[in-house]
A protein has these predicted regions:
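Cationic, low-complexity basic patches in intrinsically disordered or flexible, solvent-exposed regions
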Residues: 27
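Short, Lys/Arg-enriched N-terminal segments with co-localized hydrophobic residues
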Residues: 62-72
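PLP-dependent amino-acid enzyme catalytic core
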Residues: 72-494
Length: 494
C-alpha cells in the first residue's frame, strides 16, 4: 500500500540519520530506532542530535523536521518544543500547537550558546530596529525573514516618581504597552502569529479573545494581507469590537463566557483548518509576549528591578514575562531575576487562588469583574503561569474593581498614562502589595500597563467621573465650580 511504503521511507530516513551520527547503532533494527526516536528518545540525546544535524547540514536538519511533519526551515537558535507536562520534545515547526503525546502545552527551547555568540557579533546597541524584532536571537524566527509591517514593541518605560510617591514606592517605573499599534501588549503575540502563519503558508488566522488579542490579531493580520475570524464574548467593550470591524475581521459575538467562546473557536479552527492564534494553544504567542521583558531589561541597562507587576487572565502574559527574563539570564545578559507580582481581579482569580494554595490544581471561577481582559474563569495556560509565579518567588495580589478604578485614576493623574481596567490592575496590585507589606517601600518596581484606556471608554468615564455641563454663562460656571468645591487658581497679576 502507498501508506506502507511512505512509513517505511520515513523509518529508513530516521534510522540512517541516527546510524550516521551515533556510533554503535548499526546493530539495532531500523524499526526499533524509529520507535525510540519518535516516542522515548531521551531529551538530551534529541537535543544533541538536533545540534549535530544543524551544524553538519541544513538539509539533514530539514529531514529531521520533516519526520515530524513540520517545516524544513532550520532555526539556528531553537532546539525544539518541549511539553510542559510529559517532557516530550518535538521540532519547532510553524504550525505546532499542543503536545502530540499528551495534549500538554509546549514551550519553545533555545540554544543559549548560539544566542550569546550571535549577540556578541551583533550587539543590541548597534541595531537601528526599535521594534520587538531587534531581539531576533531570542525569537523562533529566521534572521532573514520579513516581519509584519506594523511597529510592534519599543513601547516607553517611564520613571514615575510622582506616582511612586503616591504609592509609597521609592523606585517605580511604568511600562506603557498601550502604545503598541492596536493599543495593547497583545500586539507582540499577534505579530508573532502573523509571522508564523506566513511561514506556514497560511492565509487565514483565527482566535478567541476577551478583546485585546482579537483587535491586535485583526490589525496585524490586516497589515500583512491575511484574513481573520475572531470570536469574542458578547460582553466585550464596543471600542474593542469597533477595532475588529475597522480592521476587516469577520467578528463572531458569542453569547456566553470566555470558556464558551474559546470552545466554539477551537471547533471552528479545527473544522476549517485556520491558523490558530489562541495563546494557550500556540506556544509561539508567549515568545512574542516575552519581548516586553527584553525591552524592560534593555531600557534599564540590564539592571533588574526587584519586582515586575503583571495583570493575569489566561496566564500567557505572566508566563511570557517570566520567560523573557529567564532567557536573558540564561544568555548571560542579566545577573539576577526579578520577582513577579501576579495580579488578578478578586472577582475572577483562579490562578492566584491555586498559587496561594501552593498547588497546580486550579478550580474554575465565575467571571465577576469589569476588567474584561483578565476576566478568565477557566484559564488555558495555568501551568506556565503557576510555574512562573513559583519559580520567581512571586507575590500574589487580588484587587477589587474599586481598587482597579482607583489605579486608573492614579495612573492618569500622576503619571499621564491612560490605562484600561486590566492595564491598570498591575498598578493596583503594587499599591495593595505596599499597603499590606508584601513588598518593601524601598523596592524598585516595574508595573506593566497592558492596554490603553481608549479601548474601554465607558469604564474610563466610570472611574474618572462625568465632566461638568453648563450653559454658556459665567454665573453658571461659578455655580458649577462651587458645587464641586473647586478652588480656582488665578494667574492674573495683582
Amino acid at each position: 500500500m502507498p501508506g506502507g511504503r511512505q512509513n517505511r521511507s520515513r523509518n529508513m530516513s530516521t534510522g540512517h540519520i541516527l546510524r550516521r551520527f551515533v556510533p554503535g547503532l548499526k546493530q539495532i533494527p531500523l524499526n526499533t530506532l524509529q520507535k525510540v526516536f519518535c516516542e522515548t528518545l531521551h531529551e538530551t540525546l534529541y537535543k544533541t542530535l538536533h545540534k549535530m544535524l544543524h551544524e553538519t547540514s541544513h538539509e539533514a536538519s530539514g529531514t529531521l523536521n520533516r519526520l515530524e511533519g513540520e517545516s524544513d526551515m532550520a532555526l539556528q537558535n531553537v532546539t525544539g518544543a518541549k511539553c510542559t507536562l510529559c517532557g516530550k520534545v518535538i521540532p519547532a515547526g510553524p504550525k505546532i500547537t499542543t503536545c502530540p503525546r499528551c495534549g500538554g502545552i509546549l514551550d519553545i527551547e533555545y540554544d543559549y550558546d548560539y544566542i550569546r555568540r550571535s549577540i556578541a557579533g551583533s550587539p543590541l546597541t548597534d541595531r537601528d530596529d526599535l521594534t520587538m524584532w531587534r531581539y531576533r536571537e531570542f525569537l523562533p524566527v529566521e534572521g532573514t525573514m520579513k516581519f509584519p509591517r506594523l511597529r510592534v514593541g519599543g513601547s516607553p518605560l517611564y520613571k514615575a516618581d510622582a506616582l511612586g510617591a503616591q504609592l509609597g514606592i521609592r523606585d517605580l517605573w511604568i511600562k506603557d504597552d498601550g502604545q503598541n499599534p492596536t493599543a495593547s501588549l497583545k500586539d507582540r503575540a499577534s505579530a508573532m502569529a502573523v509571522t508564523k502563519a506566513v511561514e506556514a503558508g497560511m492565509t487565514t488566522i483565527a482566535c478567541s479573545s476577551t478583546g485585546n488579542a482579537a483587535s491586535s490579531l485583526a490589525g496585524n493580520a490586516a497589515a500583512a494581507g491575511l484574513s481573520t475570524f475572531i470570536f469574542v464574548p458578547s460582553r466585550a467593550p464596543r471600542g474593542k469590537v469597533a477595532q475588529l470591524m475597522m480592521f476587516g475581521a469577520t467578528v463572531i459575538l458569542v453569547e456566553g463566557s470566555y470558556e464558551d467562546t474559546f470552545r466554539i473557536s477551537a471547533e471552528a479552527i479545527d473544522r476549517w483548518g485556520w491558523y490558530n492564534r489562541n495563546a494557550a494553544i500556540n506556544p509561539y504567542m508567549m515568545e512574542g509576549k516575552k519581548t516586553v521583558s527584553l525591552e524592560i531589561a534593555e531600557q534599564l541597562s540590564f539592571k533588574m528591578p526587584d519586582y515586575v507587576a503583571v495583570s493575569v487572565g489566561d496566564g500567557c502574559t505572566i508566563a511570557g514575562v517570566w520567560k523573557g527574563f529567564k532567557d536573558l539570564h540564561m544568555a548571560g545578559l542579566i545577573d539576577r531575576l526579578p520577582r513577579l507580582i501576579s495580579v488578578q481581579a478578586s472577582g475572577c482569580c483562579p490562578i492566584n487562588t491555586a498559587a496561594a494554595a501552593g498547588t497546580m490544581e486550579w478550580v474554575p471561577q465565575e467571571e465577576n469583574t469589569f476588567a474584561d481582559s483578565i476576566a478568565v474563569g477557566v484559564p488555558r495556560n495555568p501551568v506556565k503561569a503557576l510555574r512562573a509565579i513559583s519559580e520567581s518567588d512571586g507575590v500574589i495580589v487580588n484587587v477589587s474593581d474599586e481598587e482597579i478604578m482607583e489605579a486608573m485614576r492614579m495612573l492618569g493623574r500622576h503619571a499621564g498614562v491612560f490605562a484600561e481596567p486590566a492595564g491598570a490592575a498591575g498598578t493596583a496590585g503594587v499599591k495593595k502589595a505596599v499597603e499590606t507589606g508584601l513588598i518593601e517601600k524601598n523596592a524598585s518596581v516595574v508595573s506593566i500597563v497592558t492596554g490603553n484606556g481608549l479601548k474601554d471608554v465607558n469604564n474610563a468615564i466610570r472611574a474618572a467621573g462625568e465632566p461638568m455641563s453648563i450653559k454658556p454663562d459665567m454665573d453658571r460656571l461659578l455655580e458649577a465650580f462651587d458645587s464641586r468645591g473647586l478652588i480656582i487658581p488665578s494667574q492674573k497679576p495683582d
